Amino acid sequence: MKTRSTSYSPPMAGLAILLALALLAAGCTQPAADGHAQTLKITGSTTVLPVAQAAADAFMKDHLNANIQVTGGGSSVGVQAVGEGIAEIGMSSRDLKPEERAKYRDLVDVAIANDGIAIIVHPSNRVPSLTMAQIKEIYAGNTTNWKDVGGPDMTIVVVGRDSASGTREFFSESVMKKQDFTPTQLEKNSNGAVKQTIAQTPGAIGYVGLGYIDADIRPVPINVNNALVEPTIANVVAKTYPIARPLIMITNGAPEGLAKTYLDYLLSPAGQAIVAEEGFVPITA
């Protein structure tokens, strides 16, 4: 799988959302260099970003008049940017919230891939597996040493995502069952930043999308009824991996023009091949 880039995680997620939207809006007035290119702005989830960027690169090779700009910022940024007309397509690694649908009544979402959320640790940590209950207790701050879950005698450093993250929202619902995260959690603004922290911190635990797994970190199998289930594409397809979710694209109303052509490409066999190449699960699998 490909190595993902990392980025700094600011302490104030709300400020980060506003800044991301301001920067995106500032780019809306820039004319195309040749006067003919069509610009498509896509923003949001850092989980979906690698797929969207790779698809955009391939798409633009065959559509020379297309200028597709893909940026991250988190799922909440993607939803808000589309709802307020700052971007044509939003990326999200979670379902739309009821309050978002109420605020932006014309939002339309389409699943473009499936994904699993891998629990990751430093490569030196050989904890054999974790149950869903153990993961919840760690992230709630009730389990603080790896020896209590079959690992080394070492303090657990909890690493998660900031409040703009769709991955965090899904993790909160599917793993935490809405229980509060420990206040000592280190909050990062991207999958890449989580991965980098885990790779540099022997006692750390984190969670990332399947496409971010590489040799720098170690994915931990999840113990499901005494069966150890690895975070793999095959197990997501088989529906045996317990932390899985769809990845979606969002438009304000039914997609039209370049946005529709791009989304049609992403859902085509060529686009779904890119989904697989980036380490995610094709929607048709």
Describe each PLM feature range:
Residues 1-34:
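Secretory targeting signatures
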Residues 28-285:
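Exported/periplasmic ABC-transporter solute-binding proteins
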